[in-house]
Regions:
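Substrate-binding pocket helix/loop in short-chain dehydrogenase/reductase
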Residues: 99-100, 107-112, 207
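Active-site helix of classical SDR
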Residues: 123, 159, 167
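Residue(s) in the substrate-gating loop at a strand-loop-helix junction
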Residues: 143
Length: 251
C-alpha cells in the first residue's frame, strides 16, 4: 500500500544531513511538504534543492533548536510560510565521545541539549498547532544507545534514554487528541557520525560482528519507517519505540 502524506507539513530538525536528510526525502516522496531545520545553511540549501529537483516541496529554516528564542522564531516562520505543521520529527543530536570523568559540564550539557532539550522545545512549540485537528505525528529519534551502551557514550546514552521516557509521557498526554508520539532507535547506519568507524577496517569489523544482519543499515530504511509512522495506518501506534538495528539488541 502506497503511503500518501499529501497535504501534510513535516518539520524535521537535523534535516541537513544523515538520517534527517533521508527522512525528509522519503516524506517528500510520499507527498509531504518539508520544513528543514538545522544550523548549516549550505547543507540545508543542498537538501532543499534536491527535494525540489525530485518534484517535492521544501523550505529551510536556519536555527539552533537548543535555544528557546530560535525555536520560537522558527515556529513562527514555519507557520507564516507553510501553515500549521502536522508532523514533527526531532532528529537533532550530537555525540561527544569521552569517559564520564573527562567531560566538562558544558560538554555533557551540550549533548543533552542537542537531543533532549531540543525535543522538549520543539514539541512545546509545534504540538499545540496539532491539537483539535484529528491528526498529529511526533517522531523522536533515540538510538540503540538508549537501550545498550559502549564506552565513551555516557552523555549520548543518557540523552537518548531520556528521550524514551519523554516519548512515553507525551504519548499519554496526547493520545486523546489523535496525536501519536513514537521513537525510532537506529542502530549502526552509514552516516557521517560513523564515518571514522567505517573507514577503519578494525573498528568496522568489530561493529559488523555485533550486528546479526552483518551489515550497516541503509538510511532509506529509517526513511521508510518514518513514513509509516506518519501515515494513517499507524494511527493506533503511540508511545512505543521502533528499533532498526539489524538484530543488535536482540542478542
Amino acid at each position: 500500500m502506497k503511503i500518501d502524506l499529501t497535504g501534510r507539513t513535516a518539520v524535521i530538525t537535523g534535516g541537513s544531513r544523515g538520517l534527517g536528510e533521508a527522512m525528509a526525502k522519503a516524506l517528500a516522496e510520499s507527498g509531504a511538504r518539508i520544513a528543514l531545520v538545522a544550523r548549516d545553511v549550505k547543507r540545508l540549501e543542498v537538501v532543499r534543492d534536491a527535494i525540489r529537483k525530485s518534484g517535492g516541496t521544501a523550505e529551510f529554516f536556519a536555527g539552533d533548536v537548543t535555544r528557546e528564542d530560535d525555536v520560537a522564531r522558527v515556529a513562527g516562520e514555519v507557520k507564516q510560510r507553510m501553515g500549521a505543521a502536522q508532523i514533527l520529527i526531532n532528529n537533532a543530536g550530537i555525540n561527544i565521545r569521552k569517559n564520564l570523568v573527562d567531560y566538562t559540564l558544558a560538554e555533557f550539557q551540550s549533548v543533552m541539549d542537542a537531543s533532549l532539550t531540543s525535543t522538549f522545545l520543539m514539541c512545546r512549540a509545534f504540538v499545540p498547532g496539532m491539537k483539535g485537528t484529528g491528526y498529529g505525528r511526533v517522531i523522536n529519534m533515540s538510538s540503540i544507545m538508549g537501550h545498550v551502551s559502549l564506552p565513551g557514550r555516557t552523555a549520548y546514552s543518557s540523552a537518548k534514554t531520556a528521550l524514551l521516557g519523554l516519548t512515553r509521557a507525551l504519548a499519554l498526554e496526547l493520545a486523546a487528541e489523535a496525536i501519536t508520539v513514537n521513537c525510532i532507535s537506529p542502530g549502526p547506519f552509514g552516516t557521517e557520525m560513523n564515518t571514522a568507524v567505517m573507514n577503519n577496517p578494525e573498528t568496522n569489523a568489530q561493529f559488523l560482528a555485533a550486528v546479526p544482519a552483518g551489515r550497516w543499515g541503509d538510511v532509506g530504511e529509517v526513511g521508510a519507517m518514518a513514513c509509516y509512522l506518519c501515515s494513517e495506518m499507524a494511527g493506533f501506534v503511540t508511545g512505543t519505540d521502533i528499533l532498526i538495528d539489524g538484530g543488535w539488541t536482540a542478542r
